[in-house]
Amino acid sequence: MKILIINSGSSSIKFQLIDMSDESVLASGLVERIGETDTTEKNINCTFHPGTDKKHKIEICQTVADHRQGMLAAIELLGDKEQAVMSDLSEIDAVGHRIVHGGETMYQPVVVDEKVIAEITAAIPLAPLHNPGHLDGIKVAQELFTEVPHVTVFDTAFFQTIPPHAHIYALPYELYTKHRIRRYGAHGTSHKFVTNECAKLLEKPVEECNLITVHLGNGSSMSAVEGGKAIDTSMGVTPLEGLVMGTRSGDIDPAIMAFLNRNLGMSIEEIDHMLNKESGLKGICGMNDMRDIHAAADAGNELAELAVGIQTYRIRKYIGSYMAALGQVDAIVFTAGIGENDDIVRAKSLEKLENLGVILDKKLNAQRSKEPFCISTPESKIQVWVIPTNEELAIARETKAVVNA
């Protein structure tokens, strides 16, 4: 079975073709700058994995007016006869779609139908930057692949098991009943994937695993997992809540927004832009790439050093709070770009946790690997793992399960 994975955003389409017989990636690519009329840089690429160590990448510059043109460009690359990843597009057996927000009703992967489209549409106010692009991608993909099932996999689904005392805000209750304002979370596909992978490494049924999963990238989130199911997560109604991120503030005093409006004359739109695009690490030190921040800190930039301190202190606070929520923890899992590759952030995030059962092995923590590896000592009561996430494979597995059900 070959499955095409599509992550359709507002101005881009990420795609990956996976052969589920051995879960190998046949091709992966990106179409970006959709809707721009003055494209001068290469905005379409596809990397082919022909079953050997050699990869071949094609990059082109092409104006892409809309998602239909973008999808056609991706399909044209995938069907390139010279690359030999498949003989014909009819070899694609199913299409899996990543959906950021499914609201309260979409709690598991489902085959796309009118009801699913309606629910994704209804969740647009909760994910205005993402869900419209997802809908465009689904519509175009269904037109181009008419004979195969299309399956939606929701980032919010993993968090539907979070109990009311953890997902309801202390606001007038009618804001929840009438407007569905509650904690939804994000990165659920990633958190679920590393949860299942960690269970294998611990050699325990996932239903017996209590974990703290730490997804650190330009967007970052954490989850408390009890018996393989999420009982809390750091992101909220939107991906703005929680950890300090690349350009997002994470947790702040809500009254700051009223202060900015009343005293600085900032509009709601300006405040929203600032909190999402100009805050976080970038707001503190002017940079949001951890490599640049570490280099600046090493060169004596005090604000860069402060940014890392604020970031990792927030992570450590969440680890402590999730330990209290879970009672007993089997492992802490770091994943995503920063979580997998930044030993400094990992080490600082685990400082002062020895008395709580977390003992870091500095030598193990300093290594790099594309495979999962443990970074805690044998004496550590709580194991600490670095597990590379693979959201596309997770979506492919979910899609296969739905199609074969």
Swiss-Prot record:
Localization (cell): Cytoplasm
GO molecular function, a single term: acetate kinase activity
Residue sites binding Mg(2+) per the record: N7, E391
SUPFAM superfamilies according to UniProt: Actin-like ATPase domain
Pathways per UniProt: Metabolic intermediate biosynthesis; acetyl-CoA biosynthesis; acetyl-CoA from acetate: step 1/2
Entry's cofactor comment: Mg(2+). Can also accept Mn(2+).
EC supergroup of this enzyme: transferase
Catalytic activity: acetate + ATP = acetyl phosphate + ADP
InterPro entries: Ac/propionate_kinase, Aliphatic_acid_kin_short-chain, Aliphatic_acid_kinase_CS, ATPase_NBD
The organism's place on the tree of life at top rank: Bacteria
EC number: 2.7.2.1
Positions of the record's site feature: Transition state stabilizer: H187, R248
Binding site for substrate: R98
HAMAP family named among the record's database cross-references: Acetate_kinase
Subunit structure and binding partners: Homodimer.
The name this protein goes by in its record: Acetate kinase
Organism: Desulfotalea psychrophila (strain LSv54 / DSM 12343)
Gene encoding the protein: ackA
